[in-house]
Regions:
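N-terminal leader/targeting and accessory segments in enzymes
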Residues: 1-108, 112
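Phosphate-binding loop of NTP-binding sites
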Residues: 74-77, 90-201
Length: 201
């Protein structure tokens, strides 16, 4: 773990961190932070059967607290940092919008990964062919002898990779339009950006 990532983890100590939506990105990311002794809350409108028994057991073993069901967002006013899932946008969800108005930090797994990733980032987006292009680039890097990781919109969380990545590695990220909507103001952009194509919807 690089010093920058260690400083990031240290900056989160003593803060209440909520993950809204416990899907393929947020559940592993919540577990990653909880394993470092941080105060993490898992929020989802669905029950534990959706998240998965094994995942829930792992989260609880690391001290993660749950807020599930109809009123799953009720704890948000108490949080310092809110990680939203890709499908929950600030301008569409009043609870998330109110968090921003109160001055709470609202972010996402991918935004935090971009901020603190020490590796070279290759970002791939577009209307079609994202997963194929992302996978091809990853396999080409591996074949050429580079150390690389793959994830993002194709169903793999990137934040846990911060544990082991170094400046000589590559992070190959598939990015959806929903992820990019709130990433425009980030100082840290991809080292290489790939746009497969753009179609109107």
């Amino acid at each position: 773990m690089t010093e920058k990532v260690k400083e990031y983890i240290a900056s989160l100590r003593g803060k209440k961190i909520a993950f809204v939506g416990m899907g393929v990105a947020n559940a592993p990311s919540a577990l990653f932070l909880a394993r470092h002794g941080l105060q993490v809350y898992a929020c989802d409108s669905r029950d534990e059967s959706y998240i998965g028994k094994k995942t829930c057991e792992e989260l609880r073993a690391c001290g993660v607290q749950f807020s599930l069901g109809k009123d799953y967002l009720r704890i948000l006013p108490e949080m310092d940092i809110v990680f939203r899932s890709n499908g929950i946008l600030p301008f569409q969800n009043p609870w998330i919008g109110e968090c921003i108005e109160r001055g709470q930090t609202v972010t996402s797994e991918m935004e935090e990964f971009f901020r603190y990733c020490p590796a070279k980032i290759i970002g791939i987006t577009g209307s079609n062919g994202k997963t194929t292009t992302t996978t091809l680039i990853y396999e080409m890097l591996k074949k050429a002898g580079h150390s690389a990781v793959i994830g993002g919109n194709l169903g793999k969380a990137m934040l846990p990779y911060l544990e082991d990545l170094t400046p000589s590695d590559y992070a190959v990220c598939e990015l959806s339009s929903f992820q990019l909507l709130t990433m425009g103001n980030l100082v840290h952009q991809p080292d290489i950006a790939v746009v497969t194509n753009i179609e109107s919807t």
